[in-house]
Amino acid sequence: TIGIFDYLLNEDIKNIERKKNDPIVIAGNLSSVKAKYLKKLLPEKNIKINLYGKGLDFDLPKNITYKGTFLPDNIAGKIDGGYGLVWDGNDIDKCSGVYGKYLKYNNPHKASLYIVSQLPLIVPSTSAISKFVLKNKIGLTINSIKDIDNKLKQIKEEDYKEMQKNLRILSKKLLSGTYLKNVVNEIIKDWS
């Protein structure tokens, strides 16, 4: 199983109070080449989305708000939302295309961003990061973006608070370089 990347910052992130009904966050490269699925998000859904990143090259439906571009060192404490979506590719039904299929093998940087931002993750069930998310109880998995509305309705307030608690713990680990230290210690142990 895949682990997670640390997310080192010069400043500490305070505990952030999130609400489960706040908009879903999508951060990263927003161009239609990498995130073609964004063009297929339906405006009539009850889901509100906040976009962060560069490359936005199409008009947005009313339920999607573009929040701008931030440097990786500055965005973590500024993200406004209730969940962070990890999804790439051409389609909303599955992670397709080169970028979508890559999520089966990749640990996306945005997952670490969402964790240090204390945002519960929504990830594809086929992604390499899905087992990490479920094991650490920091989010949920979906087969299709169309599943999000129903999945979120099933999340109880106490479930969301547990995810928040787990994210605060994990956030501190990522911010302090715990996962890199673990890898280095494993390498040293193997060479001893």
Give residue spans per PLM region.
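Conserved catalytic-core segment of nucleotide-activated headgroup transferases in glycan assembly
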Residues: 5-80
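A charged, aromatic-enriched C-terminal amphipathic alpha-helix characteristic of glycosyltransferases
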Residues: 15-16, 143-146, 150, 157-192
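Active-site-proximal region of nucleotide-activated glycan assembly enzymes
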Residues: 1
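Short alpha-helical
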Residues: 32-33, 128, 147
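Nucleotide-sugar-dependent
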Residues: 79-117, 123-131
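Anion (oxyanion) recognition and catalysis
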Residues: 43, 115, 134
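A short acidic/histidine/glycine-rich donor-binding loop in glycosyltransferase catalytic cores
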Residues: 136-142
